[in-house]
Amino acid sequence: MDYLDLGPYSSASGTVRLPGSKSISNRVLLLAALAEGETTITNLLDSDDTRVMLDALGKLGVRLTRDADTCVVAGTRGAFTARTADLFLGNAGTAVRPLTAALAVNGGDYRVHGVPRMHERPIGDLVDGLRQIGAQIDYEQNEGFPPLRIKPAAITVDAPIRVRGDVSSQFLTALLMTLPLVKAKDGKIVVEVDGELISKPYIDITIRLMERFGVTVERDGWQRFVVPAGVRYRSPGRIMVEGDASSASYFLAAGALGGGPLRVEGVGRASIQGDVGFANALMQMGANVSMGDDWIEVRGIGHDHGKLDPIDMDFNLIPDAAMTIAVAALFASGTSTLRNIASWRVKETDRIAAMATELRKLGAVVEEGPDYLVVTPPQRLTPNATIDTYDDHRMAMCFSLVSLGGVPVRINDPKCVGKTFPDYFDRFAALAKA
């Protein structure tokens, strides 16, 4: 197995320009493909997850032109021209869920599948929602999971669509993005959410991007959404993808642990991504954080003892960035508790189990619950730990931070960061100093 040895490092400082947001990139690609007109996208993320979306759109007949700086998408005016396609979507939830919904109303015969882990990630709640409007979707293997066969169907809406919100917000995102393509008698479609909606900021991203493409969603709190029916997305002409706020979390934490100053550019106060809230969590732990419209800077920890404060926090709104807090908890002066992180269980790996296992390798005492993690840091980090990454990009990036604790660490399968941030370790090494 490939591995990468990091550290020991004693400081981290500098400036990093973030790659484009994965969540925004794949949403914008699909909206541009479904829109009327041509869209020029700048700062599109170049990663495994965006490549599978681009490949799928190409197979569906979408004309795409890409160079080093831009991606130009010729919209299909709401209907893919390819009526049959076999689509491999890797482990990209941001591609599988929205594309499944769009294909279900497109009137073709499609197969959607991915890597083995994707076939363990639930999609049943989305399929149930789509079946309520007549979609014909079959499971090839296990009920509730990909691979899927999608067949032509007569789509009709005569009642509110109900969808669970407590497993993944991507099911609701997929419905919201697709339903404008569907006709309804009174010109609108109501979606009602069962249970508490998790990861609400990601729904906010979806709604804001739909607005950029000319479609306005009304919402009543986070339980009821009204989508205009039978309308057409319109290209905004040009759209820039802001930096990835989840990826920012590793560098911001490095600025705290390594003294800084460390500035990330591409996200800030003006960001539409909820994961900029990570900066607030870091401030609660005692880090010195400042922020502009499109930058965030961290200058070490505001304590003489040099340790972060422990944190007890509900991370429902920022589950991805919360992984970075779990590793930062190794550097705290006491026990930290991460609550409401059940969605970790159905991500690229079971992140609660994986995080607990790897933190223990570094000497931490960890209590693992169904939707929480309690981390008590060791007196001293265990040097030369070998961290398994479970083919999960965020596990690899999070645990790079251990090297700032003055101990070397080995990261197995470092190339898994290709899912969202292919040159992460080069960027990290340029900022970390022995």
From Swiss-Prot:
This protein's record includes keyword Transferase: yes
InterPro entries per record: Enolpyruvate_Tfrase_dom, Enolpyruvate_Tfrase_sf, EPSP_synthase, EPSP_synthase_CS, RNA3'P_cycl/enolpyr_Trfase_a/b
A biological-process GO annotation: chorismate biosynthetic process
Keywords: Amino-acid biosynthesis, Aromatic amino acid biosynthesis, Cytoplasm, Transferase
GO CC annotations, alphabetized: cytoplasm
Reaction equations catalysed: 3-phosphoshikimate + phosphoenolpyruvate = 5-O-(1-carboxyvinyl)-3-phosphoshikimate + phosphate
NCBIfam families found in the cross-reference section: aroA (TIGR01356)
Main function: Catalyzes the transfer of the enolpyruvyl moiety of phosphoenolpyruvate (PEP) to the 5-hydroxyl of shikimate-3-phosphate (S3P) to produce enolpyruvyl shikimate-3-phosphate and inorganic phosphate.
Protein name, entry field: 3-phosphoshikimate 1-carboxyvinyltransferase
Organism listed in the record: Burkholderia vietnamiensis (strain G4 / LMG 22486) (Burkholderia cepacia (strain R1808))
Lineage, broadest ranks: Bacteria, Pseudomonadati, Pseudomonadota, Betaproteobacteria, Burkholderiales
Gene symbol of the encoding locus: aroA
